[in-house]
Amino acid sequence: MAFLQISEPGQSAAPHQHKLAVGIDLGTTNSLVASVRSGEANTLPDMKGNVILPSVVQYQDDKICVGANAYQSAASDPQNTIISVKRLMGRSLKDIQTRYPDLPYQFTESDNGLPVIHTTQGDVNPIQVSAEILKSLSNRAEVTLGGSLEGVVITVPAYFDDAQRAGTKDAATLAGLNVLRLLNEPTAAAIAYGLDSGQEGIIAVYDLGGGTFDISILRLSKGVFEVLATGGDSALGGDDFDHVLSQWIKDQAEITTALSNQEQRELLTLATETKVALSDADSVTVSFKEWSGTITADIFNQLIQSLVKKTLMACRRALKDADISSEDVMEVVMVGGSTRTPIVRRSVGDYFAKTPLTSIDPDQVVAIGAAIQADILVGNKPDTEMLLLDVIPLSLGIETMGGLVEKIIPRNTTIPVAKAQEFTTFKDGQTGMMVHVVQGEREMVEDGRSLARFSLKGIPPMTAGAAHIRVTYQVDADGLLSVTAMEKSTGVQSHIQVKPSYGLSDNEVATMLKDSMTYAKDDMKARALAEQQVEADRVIEGLVVALNNDGDALLSKEEQTVILQAVEALITVRKGTDTQAIEDGIKHADEASQEFAARRMDASIRAALAGQSIDEV
């Protein structure tokens, strides 16, 4: 006899069975994988007992090498050994060459403008390189856990934009992984820290990794993680310490000629080793080519002081966004290997006036938090134990007539979120509408960041203002934006998923936020002027059409002249920048045409009732 196993919809046939899920910290310098076993979240080691996998991929003639072995080949085979690929994710070739001119790779540009790296195995893109790192981590997890993974949570910097997040998802798909969620790195750290220590209150998560910096201000209360504000820089990290130090060594060695790719990699490797050594020593002797010298911790601190100060400026902005002071912060959590640098810990401690918490390994805390979240999302733990509220860093809006920005989703709104707003047509008979998606805090489109454009066609021809177009902005849990425009009477709609072609650094974010405050008054004046100009255009076009259609039938020549003079006066002031003059011109045109409007209304009613009896009416 055969038995049919029955289970509740959406549940496992064996609900007691533990599903295998992991959290992956896909870092710029190093990557880790962690999982929850027997209620404890721990990072998973490789066969040699190492939990950290260097984020390095080497392409050899007959195989691909990932991790420590690949890193050892960086100096001898720099063109085929890809390091810090996370920095390249979602960026254009032009952007990469501007930001990182010293990279030893042979780049070419693909048809879509994205970078391709030439290796001995052919051309590869950053997504393919990242996929190799993810494959290595997932293989390690499956060997350690003894089964196939049902899902993964992958962490990303809070300031990764849509293209960078989408690229990370694509890399996971290429690696054969089921992505349960992309999780902001500081939020993952908060999960690990909050659950392990049972803290409640305001916590600052200071995350300085190899290639990115993030600061998150979070409120932890009764298992609820709410991100009050985020800040940071997607192009600042320990790698920059290495570059500054390598430049100092070049200057000391009086090297003026260009270095070969191999020499450049050797220099960066030397700088990295020197930086690590200075975390525990007051001075280190270094040698490069024919030069040998000593660098002290004080010199190193001076070299990186401006970079550390940039992180503290981001902390200040995040606190201001959260509307709290540094005194309100209960604890400061340090995340990322670069926070081991003594001057970083001292500077952060001085700024927040408290000793930063380092009880959880700063290299492992993000992976541990991701593992806890993965364990919940895969169904091993009731998700009611924790609520996670991320936020979007910059407002999302739409361009309206006059080059104005109508904000749909304000910055620091918790995600996932969906918001809709209705718009209408500007001209009679308009059958299409261009939807321009913009990002930023300014009032005018020209001062914001353009994300995407798409057209909605098939709008039924109607009088201006009669059509109703509903525009919906939806940001999912991974921070990806989808925009839909629908004409309500017909249901015709158009849709786009926004994927910018390059990243948005915190310097640009900070500039956009600073400008929105600096130019707030000017922006409001510009907006008021643009609004009056749009209204003037509407009045002018409406009166011109009305006069052409009904002027001779309903008005005398003298009456037409009065209205035309008002229209011409409005056209004249419309060209200027005096908001009040335009408003007065609109008012004068309205007053001059009131009788005309009344006669048109009467004529329309008579035409509608012509031939009908009182009973029919």
Curated annotation (Swiss-Prot):
Q: Which domain of life is it from?
A: Bacteria
One matching Pfam family is HSP70
Q: Does the keyword Zinc apply?
A: no
Alphabetized GO MF terms: ATP binding; ATP hydrolysis activity; ATP-dependent protein folding chaperone; unfolded protein binding
The protein's matches in InterPro entries, at most eight in alphabetical order, are given as:
ATPase_NBD, Heat_shock_70_CS, HscA_NBD, HSP70_C_sf, HSP70_peptide-bd_sf, Hsp_70_fam, ISC_FeS_clus_asmbl_HscA
Q: Which UniProt keywords apply?
A: ATP-binding, Chaperone, Nucleotide-binding
Under the heading CDD domains, the entry gives:
ASKHA_NBD_HSP70_HscA
Tell me which Gene Ontology terms the entry assigns under biological process. iron-sulfur cluster assembly
Q: Does the keyword Nucleotide-binding apply?
A: yes
- By its UniProt entry, which PROSITE patterns does this protein fall under? HSP70_1, HSP70_2
User: What exactly does this protein do?
Assistant: Chaperone involved in the maturation of iron-sulfur cluster-containing proteins. Has a low intrinsic ATPase activity which is markedly stimulated by HscB.
Give the family per the record. Answer: Belongs to the heat shock protein 70 family.
Q: Which PANTHER family match?
A: HEAT SHOCK PROTEIN 70KDA (PTHR19375)
Name-wise, this protein is: Chaperone protein HscA homolog
Q: Which organism is it from?
A: Aliivibrio salmonicida (strain LFI1238) (Vibrio salmonicida (strain LFI1238))
